């Protein structure tokens, strides 16, 4: 007997969605068991958004739901059990235990330890009765002695820690959550909260939550047989929470699109109060497969006053955003260069800036340059022996650009000319610098509507994301080059 997931949803008629997910918890270990038990009839637990829409439709709680629906409203579908099948993405999620009480919908998905086709009788699914007991226990806890919305918010903020004791790994141990509350020594909601020693003050003003996702992509490209190109994405999620109260609670969910790359090696700030085990165990050392946890990644936390890094992560994206080759050959007193760059079709073609820096170390100043470029502009810094290819804000429709030419140098001055111990002879590189706003290579984003804030006032929530190049090198394929490996990119 176990539960795959549990939700608390406030019914809000007149709002665009007619409801808000106030709390949700998934149990990845139980989900893996469901995949094994159910076999070909397995239907995964959906994200909060699709579940909310499907449940409100099935319960006839949508404002615009006035038409007769045969599959739901016919006489053959009269429901007296509070157990439903939700049609989500063309598949039916069953059984879903759900009921409405005091404008709050309580719902859970019990584990069925057998195939779902044909559908087994309810009396044989022991998790259903446990699900009712679980939800009634949560209801009793939320509304026992509850007088106003602030007390309800406080109790909702305590649920993540309470369920760690009352329902670890989806298995209900004690439906009386008050027992777990006493065991964890929570302060009673009637007692004033104490100012924590690490929080030097409290915020007063308009509530707002700002979320910023920054991904940096590193790459070493060689265009050589026997030497593999390497690339790595490192992400940082930064938050600034201006919220009134001594101990406000916030839950932020990071989501991925269907074809997104799973997040790995996740490190979180100490203010994060709890995490699903699947988030902590996802590692870049493990081989990627279809069973890799792909979110949503939920981070409940009590924010400090200042801006802070909520978490760091890595990801193994299938291809680098820009592929290229660089060829440089010395011909008598000049260098002949050929460069080709191609933007991958899946990458957003809208840069804040994009440049290729082409340095020539251990040589004299540039005295003569002849070149031909298919796109962009070339700037010459003669004394620095540097070319900067300004690509601009977009690649052409072909997604491919090229630059070729010859460079002649004057006499070398050891005091002024750039020196590098690695780039000797024909060993050379070009380095890409670019930034793309409102985009991440993994597809990771923070859904503003899924942010849960347990504090007074309705905060303004903003979310931003960007992709930045970092140590993005393309080496001369006609000469030796230093070799790195994926594990060393960090």
From Swiss-Prot:
Keyword Transport attached: yes
Record's keyword annotation contains Cell division: no
Main subcellular location of this protein, as a coarse class: cytoplasm
Gene3D superfamilies xrefs: Mu homology domain, subdomain B
Keywords associated with the record: Cytoplasm, Endosome, Lysosome, Membrane, Protein transport, Transport
Listed Pfam families: Adap_comp_sub (PF00928)
Tissue expression notes: Expressed in various tumor cell lines including Jurkat, Hep-G2 and HeLa.
Annotated compartments: Cytoplasm, Cytosol; Late endosome membrane; Lysosome membrane
A single GO BP: endosomal transport
CDD domains, sorted: AP_MuD_MHD
Domain MHD, residue spans: 206-476
PANTHER family: AP-5 COMPLEX SUBUNIT MU-1
Subunit structure and binding partners: Probably part of the adaptor protein complex 5 (AP-5) a tetramer composed of AP5B1, AP5M1, AP5S1 and AP5Z1.
Role noted for this protein: As part of AP-5, a probable fifth adaptor protein complex it may be involved in endosomal transport. According to PubMed:18395520, it may play a role in cell death.
Name of the protein: AP-5 complex subunit mu-1
Organism this protein belongs to: Homo sapiens (Human)
Gene: AP5M1
């Amino acid at each position: 007997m176990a539960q795959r997931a549990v939700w608390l949803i406030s019914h809000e008629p007149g709002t665009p969605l007619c409801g808000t997910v106030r709390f949700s918890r998934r149990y990845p270990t139980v989900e893996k068991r469901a995949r094994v038990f159910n076999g070909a009839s397995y239907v995964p637990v959906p994200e909060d958004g699709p579940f909310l829409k499907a449940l409100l439709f099935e319960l006839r709680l949508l404002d615009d739901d006035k038409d007769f629906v045969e599959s739901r409203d016919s006489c053959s579908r009269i429901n007296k059990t509070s157990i439903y099948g939700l049609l989500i993405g063309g598949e039916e999620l069953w059984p879903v235990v759900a009921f409405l009480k005091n404008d709050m919908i309580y719902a859970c998905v019990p584990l069925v330890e057998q195939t779902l086709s044909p559908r087994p009788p309810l009396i044989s699914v022991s998790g259903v009765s446990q699900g009712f007991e679980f939800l009634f226990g949560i209801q009793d806890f939320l509304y026992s002695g509850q007088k106003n919305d602030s007390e309800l918010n406080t109790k909702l903020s305590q649920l993540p820690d309470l369920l760690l004791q009352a329902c670890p790994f989806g298995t209900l141990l004690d439906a009386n959550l008050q027992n777990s509350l006493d065991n964890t020594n929570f302060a009673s909601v009637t007692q004033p909260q104490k100012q924590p020693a690490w929080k030097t003050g409290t915020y007063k003003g308009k509530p707002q939550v700002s979320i910023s996702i920054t991904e940096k992509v590193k790459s070493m490209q060689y265009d050589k047989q026997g030497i593999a190109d390497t690339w790595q994405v490192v992400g940082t999620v930064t938050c600034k929470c201006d919220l009134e109260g001594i101990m406000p609670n916030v839950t932020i969910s990071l989501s991925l699109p269907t074809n997104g790359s799973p997040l790995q090696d996740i490190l979180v700030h100490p203010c994060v109060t709890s995490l699903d085990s699947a988030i902590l165990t996802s590692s870049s050392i493990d081989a990627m497969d279809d069973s890799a946890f792909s979110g949503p990644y939920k981070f409940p936390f009590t924010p400090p006053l200042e801006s802070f890094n909520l978490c760091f992560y890595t990801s193994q994206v299938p291809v680098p955003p820009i592929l290229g080759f660089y060829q440089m050959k010395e011909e008598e007193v000049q260098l002949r260069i050929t460069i080709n760059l191609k933007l991958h079709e899946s990458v957003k073609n809208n840069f804040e800036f994009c440049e290729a820096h082409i340095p020539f170390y251990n040589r004299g100043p540039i005295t003569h340059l002849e070149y031909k470029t298919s796109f962009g502009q070339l700037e010459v810094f003669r004394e620095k022996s540097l070319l900067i290819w300004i690509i601009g804000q977009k690649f052409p429709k072909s997604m491919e650009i090229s630059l070729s030419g010859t460079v002649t140098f004057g006499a070398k001055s050891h005091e002024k000319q750039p020196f590098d111990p690695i780039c000797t002879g024909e060993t050379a590189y070009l380095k890409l610098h670019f930034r793309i706003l409102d985009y991440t290579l993994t597809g990771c984003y923070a859904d503003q509507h899924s942010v849960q804030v347990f504090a007074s006032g309705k905060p303004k929530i903003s979310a931003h994301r960007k992709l930045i190049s970092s140590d993005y090198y393309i080496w001369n394929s006609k000469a030796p080059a230093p070799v790195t490996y994926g594990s060393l990119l960090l």
